[in-house]
Amino acid sequence: MFQTFRNAWKIPELKNRLLFTLAILVVYRLGCAIPVPFVSGSALTQMFANGDMLSYLNMMSGGALARCTLFALGVTPYINASIIVQLLTVAIPALENLAKEADGQQKLQQINRYAGAVVALIMSIGYYFVIRNMGALKYVSGAAGVFAAVVIIATFVAGAQLITWAGEQIDDKGIGNGISLLIFASIVSNWSSLYTSVTGLLTRAAAGEPQFYILLPVLVILALVAVVFVVVMTNAERRITIQYAKRVVGRKQMGGQNSYLPLKLNMSGVMPIIFASALVSIPGTIGSFLQIDQQAHPVWYAFFHTFNYTSWLYVVIYLLLILAFNYFYVAIQYNPVEIANNLRRNNGSIPGFRPGKPTSDFITRTLNKITLIGAIFLAAVAVLPIILGNLTGMSIQLGGTSLLIVVGVALDTTRSLDSFMTMRNHKGFLG
């Protein structure tokens, strides 16, 4: 491993890309520490310690939301905008045709930026009122209050756009996927909170609950097993054999070779979890924004509290949405009829199935089986940490979404680095 890094460091272009990526990540973490003007960050600490949806969003922003800093919104506006644009691409024919054009992806990326700015503005306004309701603002009335509101909201929006720009710079000049690496950095920065959870278990064990001495190593083993499980399932794929008929082009014989069609078990990645989280967290987030008083409005308080991410109703709805959106995203990404037609045009076929409808039907059946297994995998990884946290009373920061993102980004970045080195005849991680 260390030899591989030394070999990578000897390649000037790769060295520059690694340094550039590291520099962007350092700047991102510095931005997470720059406070927004006119806000008292200490007044917000208690609100984010209650385990509600804002606490979850704070984890995804690397703690910047609780400290009310420049990058408080994190990459959430960009992710939500990307989801909206993807759904509109399926629903609106003009956008669907645009996605198929040569330069269509660049135009869609520009639409993503504008949509991300709108989402960031909406979230900034909502978070401003949360800060105001918590009494964390230095100026709330008069011209000073208006000026403070404009500055705070503009700072949040500018920070969100700057994060989007930083992610795109990593895509162009660095290694790996920029936005994914920024999320990775945010999640990893919160791992220090695991130390607090561990010391809490040891304290309870020393106070007369010796079962926690057994629980701690069990949790460590389960975490390691979960990481291995996610790595294996993320890389798992079903390979369908493809045979190409021989044909003569000029004086050369073409084809006659066997290949395969790879169908990954987790084809949709973490997107179903992110989208399901966005939908099921809306009531809880609104409740956090409104700061409803339990004594004055007990019914509304109970309703919004029901959608707290540690409640059992949240777990059930979350699980069902993950299953549904996993099928939805696979249906968007894969068209069995189009795959079958492409195979026919290239003189390819699946052994035992005639070209055309029989081939597309077989691919459809295979996709349905794989999608079911992948959906169960995603649901288990996302929901089990929440259930475990409810049963043990621990605040498990490394949830299913975090685990999938961390493992997925690590694997993708490793592949990118290995591919870069393989092109220069260097032995990489996977070789």
Predicted region positions:
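N-terminal cationic and glycine-rich segments that engage phosphates or anionic surfaces
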Residues: 1-99, 103-431
